[in-house]
Curated annotation (Swiss-Prot):
InterPro entries: Chitinase_II/V-like_cat (IPR011583), Chitinase_insertion_sf (IPR029070), Glyco_hydro18_cat (IPR001223), Glycoside_hydrolase_SF (IPR017853), Glycosyl_Hydrlase_18 (IPR050314), IDGF (IPR015520). The lineage of its organism: Eukaryota, Metazoa, Ecdysozoa, Arthropoda, Hexapoda. Pfam families: Glyco_hydro_18. Glycosylated. Residues 25-441 form the GH18 domain. The keyword Signal applies. It comes from Drosophila melanogaster (Fruit fly). This is Chitinase-like protein Idgf3. Belongs to the glycosyl hydrolase 18 family. IDGF subfamily. GO terms for biological process: carbohydrate metabolic process; chitin catabolic process; chitin-based cuticle development; ecdysis, chitin-based cuticle; imaginal disc development; regulation of chitin metabolic process; wound healing. Changing L139F: In strain: MB29b. Changing R250H: In strain: MB33a and MB36a. GO terms for cellular component: extracellular region. Cooperates with insulin-like peptides to stimulate the proliferation, polarization and motility of imaginal disk cells. May act by stabilizing the binding of insulin-like peptides to its receptor through a simultaneous interaction with both molecules to form a multiprotein signaling complex. Lacks the typical Glu active site in position 153 that is replaced by a Gln residue, preventing the hydrolase activity. Its precise function remains unclear.
Length: 441
């Protein structure tokens, strides 16, 4: 074959490879196995999983944990995972869905048995790392997973504080000199330990043709813990937790957009609280765009509005009183799943309702830059005030389009069990998942 023909063939293959990347983006579906333990309309069944799988490229089972004494990876719900064989149930679907990769995730803020076992793991040296790696590989192989997702529970950034203009200026001045924003004085050492762990873990998994992904949890400072250029070659993809920048638990006194795509300027906002900043950080660290998946949440964050919060609902909303009451399905203060949020929108069943069942006012973001919100001002007694920041199918679709436009790997959905998987709102099951998939096609 002549040199020109070889060149033409090489160029054609390169074009085809690029087309393949852009034509088949990732839709990484996180599945919180605790959803199968919920009651009533919130219970997520194997039938629900099967319906969702037609839209996913990867299914990530959450979650395993780390034993704080011996650093081995272990089940954190042995009754469900092992005795009821839920791990095996999930991977048994591989035969029917051979195009999907099934991963087991460790951490993910679900491992609450010990507060700092992940830092202890990093500091445990080669022996501790080896125990974790061997146990992780054994667990993944025993239950026939295709790989491991590493969702390390590392110290979080301190939340934004509420101050007046003068107070904010003084606080910034003070922080510059005292460094009181630092939450981990050993972060540089820990970064090196994370790098070593990921490289060794990847090498061990690759011996058995297993995948390794990294999930960066919300509000974990990537620059503190992840040496991106060093770890990227060892990772098949990276899921960014680009949501929960503000939550009622972290920011009880003010409500604001929890998952904006771009920076919402003004009002003492922090420039890194948005999807675009986080994604650009990894790109600037020379991580290939097609290894980055942006995270989209299927739930919203909800604050309790007080009389002093006003009645406009426009963020930043002052004088909030922490998390709003839990929803009837999600049963978690300060969090409402998409079905619960949708049911609060004006509809025939709540048009005359008052008090906690009164409808909310929906405010759509026409720019698609910040996200939608909904609110119900507090009544004359200061009760029943509610403010919700959320992504809906429209904004999720816009974020998926963002991922396509930036030639990213795709989207990671957190998670299937908080989507409207029963179609309670519009009779359309998994509306968030579907909206993302159709935009990624």
């Amino acid at each position: 074959m002549t040199g020109s023909l070889w060149l033409s063939l090489a160029l054609s293959l390169a074009v085809l490879a690029q087309f393949k990347v852009s034509a088949a983006p990732n839709l990484v579906c996180f599945y919180d196995s605790q959803g199968s333990q919920r009651q009533g309309l919130a219970q997520f069944s194997m039938i629900d999983i099967e319906l969702a799988l037609q839209f996913c490229t990867h299914l990530v089972y959450g979650y395993a944990g780390v034993n704080a004494d011996n650093y081995e990876m272990q089940s954190i719900n042995k009754r469900l995972d092992l005795e009821q064989r839920h791990l095996a149930q999930i991977t048994s679907m591989k035969e029917r869905y051979p195009h999907i990769k099934f991963l087991l995730s460790v951490g993910g803020d679900a491992d609450t048995n010990e507060g700092n076992q992940y830092i202890k793991l990093l500091e445990s040296g080669q022996q501790g790392h080896r125990r974790f790696i061997e146990s992780a590989r054994d667990l993944v192989r025993r239950y026939n997973f295709d790989g491991l997702d590493l969702a390390l529970q590392l110290p979080r950034n301190k939340p934004r504080k509420v101050h007046g203009d003068v107070g904010s200026a003084w606080k910034s001045f003070k922080k510059f000199f005292t460094g009181d924003f630092i939450v981990d004085t050993e972060s540089e050492t820990h970064k090196g330990q994370v790098t070593a762990l990921i490289k060794d873990l990847s090498a061990a998994l690759k011996q058995n043709d297993l995948l390794l992904s990294l999930t960066v949890l919300p509000n974990v400072n990537s620059s503190w813990y992840y040496d991106a250029p060093s770890i990227a070659p060892s990772l098949d993809f990276i899921n960014l937790g680009t949501f929960d920048f503000l939550t009622p638990q972290r920011n009880p006194e003010e409500a604001d957009f929890s998952a904006p795509t771009y920076e919402a300027v003004g009002q003492n906002r922090l420039g890194h609280y948005n999807l675009n900043f986080q994604m650009e950080h990894w790109l600037l660290q020379r991580v290939p765009a097609n290894k980055i998946n942006i995270g989209i949440a299927t739930y919203g964050r909800s604050w309790k509005m007080s009389k002093d919060s006003g009645d406009s609902g426009m963020p930043v909303v002052p004088s909030t009183q922490g998390p709003a009451p839990a929803g009837p399905q999600s049963k978690q203060e300060g969090l409402l799943n998409w079905a619960e949020i949708c049911s609060l929108m004006p509809n025939p069943s709540n048009s005359n309702a008052r008090g906690p069942n009164a409808p909310v006012k929906r405010v759509v973001d026409p720019t698609k830059r910040y996200g939608s919100y909904a609110f119900r001002a507090a009544d004359e007694n200061g009760d029943h005030g509610l403010w919700i920041s959320y992504d809906d199918p429209d904004s999720a679709s816009s974020k998926a389009m963002y991922a396509r436009a930036r030639n990213l790997g795709g989207v990671a959905l957190f998670d299937l069990t908080q989507d409207d998987f029963r179609g309670q709102c519009t009779n359309d099951r998994f509306p968030m998942l579907r909206a993302i998939k159709y935009r990624l096609l």
